[in-house]
Amino acid sequence: MTTYTVRIGDLVLGPGAPVAVQSMTNTCTADIEETAAQVLELARVGSELVRFTVKDEDDARAVPYIRDRVRQAGCKVPLVGDFHYNGHLLLSRYPQCLEALDKLRINPGNVGAGEHHDSNFRTMVELIAQAGKVARIGVNAGSIDKDLLERGRRENEAQGSPRSEHQVFLEAMVESALSSAAAAQKYGLP
């Protein structure tokens, strides 16, 4: 698999670059003052990227104001928006949120289910690509594509000597990440 060097603000990630520390806020993102203060504190203690959830319209509306407060304080730490079930709607309705972020995280298993998954994912990716932003496909146990996992379980049961549930789960996570990355490239991300 090819890996790329990516610039996020002044930070470089990828081959040859040092490992970067990313932190995530634990504030309500809609609380602009509290979230901006925590971003600044995390940057002060060494975080090189700061991520916060963007789960609803209040959060999406707050993002540009958070960015403004952080930048007005002289802090250039890249801001990362973590999107889940409704990211396609939030990015469509609040382009200023997208513009204010340096990077976005997409959970492929939390972008919609069944027939809506592909169109929701595609909408997010196309908006991110059009804005020239960086995205990360983030797969974890809480956001694995349930359909993909169930398919893996069915295929495993049909084998003469099935693999462990843990192995099936790990394989589904990898497949989810790789297939989502391929789809993201198809929809416009480099």
Task: Say what each PLM segment does.
Residues M1-S23:
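N-terminal amphipathic alpha-helix/helix-capping segment at the start of soluble metabolic enzymes
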Residues Q22-T25, V139:
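N-terminal pre-triad scaffold of radical SAM enzymes
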Residues A30-E41, G87-P95:
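Short, acidic/polar
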Residues S47-S179:
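Active-site beta->alpha loop and helix N-cap motifs at the rims of alpha/beta catalytic domains
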Residues S179-L189:
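Catalytic-site microenvironment of enzymes
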